[in-house]
Amino acid sequence: MPHHYILTLFGLLPVATNISTWWNFGSMLLTCLALQVLTGFFLAVHYTANINLAFSSIIHITRDVPFGWMMQNLHAIGASMFFICIYIHIARGLYYGSYLNKETWMSGITLLITLMATAFFGYVLPWGQMSFWAATVITNLLTAVPYLGTSLTTWLWGGFAINDPTLTRFFALHFILPFAIISLSSLHIILLHEEGSSNPLGTNPDIDKIPFHPYHSHKDLLLLTLMMLSLLIIVSFFPDIFNDPDNFSKANPLVTPQHIKPEWYFLFAYGILRSIPNKLGGALALVMSIMILFTIPFTHTAHLRPMTFRPFSQLMFWTLVSTFITITWAATKPVEPPFIVISQVTSTLYFTFFLLIPILGWTENKMMNTL
């Protein structure tokens, strides 16, 4: 038995015996966070936050710094891996009703928002063509805020256009926000262990629990090993798989790319933004696409916690997953028919899922009562 308090805390943590592989993604996210902070530090040592030198400093890291290419690729592809894990983690929470642990869910969505902000600031730092124009388009959405919009945008940019002060403050924010993520992650874990994690059946797990270590810790190691193996294979053989070709050119404010788009993990929100022709409406839809996740614990009306035994909710859940993938795909395409209509239909379906949660719950309750 371990003698150290922290080791004892995790080693003797009582966990339900029947939690499946879908519960492994929390530990995978923790590993991703550690990897991002570590590689990010080594990159920050060699990076220069200046619009004339930023792009050159990335080239210097890749070419001249020992293993700089590996650090840079691990950091860039590690971010994609981070978002893959977090989207699966949220999907598991939606499917198995983990959101009913309200405090944990709220802290988790706050974590998601902080992570998205951090990733956005990081995407701007290489000062490539797509980095610059994605930053211009997204930050310009602040001008849609009534009365305060222009002042807010000028304050964020540090001037009347994206320039050196913008890059400096984005670098500062990208450096400091991971520490906020670490703090929020600690809070998230504390709140989770206060009530205990759910399980696939949605039953009270108190009657059948086992220590986290060695049973679940060894199970977690399998997916962790597979994730790290996948990451290293991509870094070694397909390092540019997630990169945009435009980002291999230095930012040029005088030349607009044919098709401006952010990283793939923001495309679902960008697709929703783009599907609404009004600027303020699009900005509100973009914010609501994330903020609507806060409402789920309060709209759950079903007697059963997970969707395991709720066929209508299962159908809606998998419709949401396919909708999410379709919006992401449509957002990579030009703004022209039929992609405009596809984006509008899928955006409507995305929000419809959250509106139907209470109605489906009541319907399923009535069905069970009649059996």
UniProtKB/Swiss-Prot annotation:
Main location: mitochondrion
PROSITE patterns per UniProt: CYTB_CTER, CYTB_NTER
The organism's taxonomic lineage, starting at the top: Eukaryota, Metazoa, Chordata, Craniata, Vertebrata
Cofactor(s) the record lists: heme b
Note: Heme 1 (or BL or b562) is low-potential and absorbs at about 562 nm, and heme 2 (or BH or b566) is high-potential and absorbs at about 566 nm.
Role according to the record: Component of the ubiquinol-cytochrome c reductase complex (complex III or cytochrome b-c1 complex) that is part of the mitochondrial respiratory chain. The b-c1 complex mediates electron transfer from ubiquinol to cytochrome c. Contributes to the generation of a proton gradient across the mitochondrial membrane that is then used for ATP synthesis.
Gene Ontology MF annotations: metal ion binding; ubiquinol-cytochrome-c reductase activity
Binding site for heme b b562: 75, 174
Designated name of the protein: Cytochrome b
Pfam families: Cytochrom_B_C (PF00032), Cytochrome_B (PF00033)
Record text on subunit structure and interactions: The cytochrome bc1 complex contains 3 respiratory subunits (MT-CYB, CYC1 and UQCRFS1), 2 core proteins (UQCRC1 and UQCRC2) and probably 6 low-molecular weight proteins.
Gene: MT-CYB
PANTHER family per the UniProt record, alphabetical: CYTOCHROME B
Protein family per UniProt: Belongs to the cytochrome b family.
